[in-house]
Curated annotation (Swiss-Prot):
The gene is ZPLD1. PANTHER family: ENDOGLIN/TGF-BETA RECEPTOR TYPE III, ZONA PELLUCIDA-LIKE DOMAIN-CONTAINING PROTEIN 1. The record marks R319, D320 as: Cleavage. GO terms for biological process: vestibular reflex. Proteolytically cleaved before the transmembrane segment to yield the secreted form found in the extracellular matrix of the cupula. Pfam families: Zona_pellucida, ZP-N. Residues 43-320 form the ZP domain. The keyword Magnesium does not apply. This is Zona pellucida-like domain-containing protein 1. GO terms for cellular component: cell surface; cytoplasmic vesicle membrane; extracellular space. Detected in placenta, kidney, lung, pancreas and at very low level in other tissues.
Length: 415
């Protein structure tokens, strides 16, 4: 008897489930099941966290899109999602803007990650972890035959980015330099600018910078007399604000330099300057925008000794290196890691047939199917006509000599 009731219950569940799929991009053969972990996708974006939930399995479970809400806030319409039926399967989308991330009860936990840079400098980065859940409401009755749905999500960001993700954040470092007459402390800052004049700091639009946009960076020192200069040893980028991120792309290190990077000034004054073209990290391939953080390992050096600390890259400099006097370790300070970012870049889709040669003012010449067929037919007709002409000339050439000999019957009148 129990088996009959179980079979009847399964039949009742499957039939309404197929009917509930009407009007939505669902497949009864694929989505006649209860939700699983794979039915939610979480995208930790530049400006928002986006969650996409398989709506077909929600329908099969007996719920609608209005039954799902962030962190149990079922009475707040701002904490609900919306349906996108233009995908397969249909999904319910939830968006959490980083500027209002705690609006629907999301949890923010700040932690400090210690680390050591490649140069042995002790660093610590504060990271903010945003977590929460999406669930269905509890029934008002004591029991329920519907399963309770629960989806969890989590994203981590540098804390300085969460505090104000509309502006660039830059770190500063204090370097202590010991001299014969005492010790002084200088402050270094890494700033980003729009152009080579270094007058206006970089402003990133909400949609991000186009790829290959040139950005100008400068390391500026304060509280420094004329005997000391700024020397940038190593500048690199990471997809996060953590200078110790395993994923990094070097801009310049010693004599190795990215082709799109230009070192304008280094070791010659109290400011180091360079430029580079922005890019995107491949790990952000599923996102429309990418974050790039810039880091520079910088030190102070005496103005007279900075040339000896610069890398020897050209043959002439190697030849002249033997003439240089030796310098003492006291001629430079310790290194500091400076960071700036995030630089937000966007990936614009470019049509594959959008390239052309010649003057930009001339319209591109494109061949459609009809034009290609006409040109092919004309070429074939021309080749055939030329072949027939050659055959005709060959036949005439063969008959030419025989036509000069006259044959006939002798007329007796002329005898």
């Amino acid at each position: 008897m129990e088996q009959i009731w179980l079979l009847l219950l399964l039949t009742i569940r499957v039939l309404p489930g197929s009917a509930q799929f009407n009007g939505y991009n669902c497949d009864a053969n694929l989505h006649s099941r209860f939700p699983a972990e794979r039915d939610i996708s979480v995208y930790c974006g530049v400006q928002a966290i986006t969650m996409k939930i398989n709506f077909c399995t929600v329908l099969f479970s007996g719920y609608s899109e209005t039954d799902l809400a962030l962190n149990g806030r079922h009475g707040d319409s701002h904490c609900r999602g919306f349906i996108n039926n233009n995908t397969f399967p249909a999904v319910v989308i939830f968006i959490i803007n980083l500027s209002t991330l705690e609006g629907c009860g999301n949890n923010l936990v700040v932690s400090t990650i210690p680390g050591v840079s490649a140069y042995g400098n002790a660093t610590s980065v504060q990271v903010g972890n945003i977590s929460g859940y999406i669930d269905t409401p509890d029934p008002p009755t004591i029991i329920s035959y519907l399963p309770g749905l629960l989806y969890k999500f989590s994203c981590s960001y540098p804390l300085e980015y969460l505090v104000n993700n509309t502006q660039l954040a830059s770190s500063s470092a204090a370097i202590s330099v010991r001299e014969n007459n005492g010790t002084f402390v200088s402050t270094l800052n890494l700033l980003l600018y729009n152009d080579s004049t270094y007058n206006q700091q970089l402003i990133i639009p909400s949609i991000g910078l186009p790829l290959k946009t040139k950005v100008f960076a400068a390391v500026q020192a304060t509280n420094l007399d004329g005997r000391w200069n700024v020397l940038m040893d190593y500048c690199y980028t990471t997809p996060s604000g953590n200078p110790n991120d395993d994923i990094r792309y070097d801009l310049f290190l010693s004599c190795d330099k990215d082709p799109q990077t230009t070192v304008i000034e280094n070791g010659r004054s109290q400011r180091g300057r360079f430029s580079f073209e922005v890019f995107r990290f491949v790990k952000h391939k599923n996102q429309k925008m990418s974050t790039v953080f810039l880091h520079c390992v910088t030190k102070l050096c005496r103005a007279d000794d900075c040339p000896f600390l610069m890398p020897i890259c050209s043959h002439r400099e190697r030849r002249d290196a033997g003439r240089r006097t030796t310098w003492s370790p006291q001629s430079s300070s310790g290194s500091a890691v400076l960071s700036a970012g995030p630089i937000i870049t966007r990936s614009d889709e470019t049509p594959t047939n959008n390239s052309q040669l010649g003057s930009p003012s001339m319209p591109p010449f494109q061949l459609n199917a009809i034009t290609s067929a006409l040109i092919s037919g004309m070429v074939i007709l021309g080749v055939t006509s030329f072949s027939l002409l050659l055959c005709s000339l060959a036949l005439l050439h063969r008959k030419g000599p025989t036509s000069l000999v006259l044959n006939g019957i002798r007329n007796p009148v002329f005898d």
